[in-house]
Amino acid sequence: MPYIPMPYVVEQTHRGERSYDIYSRLLKDRIVFLGTPIDDDVANVVIAQLLFLESEDPDKDISLYINSPGGSVTSGLAIYDTMQYVKPQVSTICLGQAASMGAFLLAGGAAGKRFAVPNARIMIHQPMGGFQGQATDIDIQAREILRLKAKLNDILAKHTKQPLERIEKDTDRDYFMGAGEAKEYGLIDEVIVHKPKATEKKAQ
């Protein structure tokens, strides 16, 4: 993979200049960016940011921007569970694509606060896995992936309000949607051209 220089932002403070990498600067505005395949390392960083932002202000929304092809189911579920665990509502915004676990996280945002831009692409499907080893080990792994498949389908049905039978049918193969189709499906709430207005603190 070619090296991509990290952009830095310089700000003036009463103590002089201070520089931030672009992601740290976005974090100051309660923006978390998920722009890579999802693995344990990526999940740990996203989870740490969500927990930090909750400790900073438990009553102010967090924005999770997603441009991801998906990745590890367990890593994605760790992020999803943290989104539900933290007190701030987590708004999700899809730029580019949200596929596989990326789409799952997009759908798992706070109700009414799940967005995609007009040219975004969303794809859902069943979890994939390849196994080697003794027949009994392969059988154990196959049963586990079927358990995860059922769990993911149940959660998607809850967030989209689609019948479980439709979720099971649609995720049997890669199911691609544009932003408008994703709204009709219930994966997002709105297609947006401009950034949503900043969310104020919840009323006490």
From Swiss-Prot:
EC number: 3.4.21.92
Cellular component, GO annotation: cytoplasm; endopeptidase Clp complex
PROSITE patterns per UniProt: CLP_PROTEASE_HIS, CLP_PROTEASE_SER
Pfam families recorded: CLP_protease
Catalytic residues, chain numbering: 100 (nucleophile), 125
Superkingdom to which the source organism belongs: Bacteria
Enzyme class per UniProt: hydrolase
InterPro entries membership: ClpP, ClpP/crotonase-like_dom_sf, ClpP/TepA, ClpP_His_AS, ClpP_Ser_AS
UniProt entry keywords in alphabetical sequence: Cytoplasm, Hydrolase, Protease, Serine protease
Keyword Amino-acid biosynthesis: no
GO biological process per UniProt: protein quality control for misfolded or incompletely synthesized proteins
Record GO terms (molecular function): ATP-dependent peptidase activity; ATPase binding; serine-type endopeptidase activity
Localization in the cell: Cytoplasm
Positions of transmembrane segments: none
Record's keyword annotation contains Cell membrane: no
Reaction catalysis annotation: Hydrolysis of proteins to small peptides in the presence of ATP and magnesium. alpha-casein is the usual test substrate. In the absence of ATP, only oligopeptides shorter than five residues are hydrolyzed (such as succinyl-Leu-Tyr-|-NHMec, and Leu-Tyr-Leu-|-Tyr-Trp, in which cleavage of the -Tyr-|-Leu- and -Tyr-|-Trp bonds also occurs)
Function: Cleaves peptides in various proteins in a process that requires ATP hydrolysis. Has a chymotrypsin-like activity. Plays a major role in the degradation of misfolded proteins.
Xref: HAMAP family: ClpP (MF_00444)
Oligomer and partners: Fourteen ClpP subunits assemble into 2 heptameric rings which stack back to back to give a disk-like structure with a central cavity, resembling the structure of eukaryotic proteasomes.
NCBIfam families the UniProt entry points to: clpP, PRK00277.1, PRK12553.1
Family indicated by similarity: Belongs to the peptidase S14 family.
Protein name, per record: ATP-dependent Clp protease proteolytic subunit
Species annotation: Anaeromyxobacter sp. (strain Fw109-5)
Encoding gene, per UniProt annotation: clpP
